[in-house]
Amino acid sequence: MNKDLDIDDILQEFDDSNVHSKSSKYGIRNSENIYDQLVAAMLNERMSPDVLPYKHELMKEVLTQLSNQQQYLLDSHEYGDSNVESGIVTGDFKLQLMIIETDIERLNYLVRLYLRTRLAKIDKFTIHYINETSNDDPTNDRSLLSPEETEYMHKHFKILTQLYNNSFLKKMPHFLTLLDDTSGGQSMISVPDINQPVFIKVITKVPIIINLDEDEDLELVENGIYVVKYSLIKKYIEIGDIVLI
């Protein structure tokens, strides 16, 4: 094997090899497409000032892939242990298991990074997202948050409210204890700054026209890199025409 190959080359070579067919009954397939989609989702989430719609279908596919790979590894290790003295377990077989373990680790890392980024925003703007998702069905594939994120958000808010009440709110007049007070021209609710500038790359072939102000439009073309207000291109990120970089 060429020592200059990186892990992606090795994984691709592995996916194209005959040995891969042994794992077909576990539903293990080429994970490069899943990996690329997960990288894009993770980068978009990390670079955006607010929470993007949860990738329901992608995450379901990723978690299924991880479960299948882990089951395959478990069964393969049991097979290897029971045949260790027979000579059946070859170097190629061991390499196959090492490659799958590497694939599991990199997918796990991206999933954790994606979810931690989302939870950090939920922690920071809890009341805002409670209001934003008040009419959402978390089981719907188009909902902003996953069911687990929604549950986490409400538990986090409950704990936070109890902490504030026990620490200092119970000693204050009632009209000063509202965490979501918007009266007096000053909102107590922290919200993401959707007008901050972000770096973007256009990946759709169809040019996108965005309105900068009353007299000026900006044409975004394929493979072009721009710095624009997040609010102007958020919808294009959600439909996949633009990615954040």
Curated annotation (Swiss-Prot):
Record-level GO BP terms: chromosome segregation; DNA-templated DNA replication; double-strand break repair via break-induced replication
Cellular component GO terms, alphabetical: CMG complex; GINS complex; nuclear replication fork
Location(s) in or outside the cell: Nucleus
InterPro entries: GINS_A (IPR021151), GINS_bundle-like_dom_sf (IPR036224), GINS_Sld5 (IPR008591), SLD5_C (IPR031633), Sld5_GINS_A (IPR038749)
Main location: nucleus
Keyword Transmembrane: no
Keywords: Chromosome partition, DNA replication, Nucleus
Reported function: The GINS complex plays an essential role in the initiation of DNA replication. Has a role in chromosome segregation.
Subunit structure: Component of the GINS complex which is a heterotetramer of SLD5, PSF1, PSF2 and PSF3.
Family per record: Belongs to the GINS4/SLD5 family.
Protein name: DNA replication complex GINS protein SLD5
UniProt organism field: Debaryomyces hansenii (strain ATCC 36239 / CBS 767 / BCRC 21394 / JCM 1990 / NBRC 0083 / IGC 2968) (Yeast)
Source organism phylogeny: Eukaryota, Fungi, Dikarya, Ascomycota, Saccharomycotina
Gene: SLD5
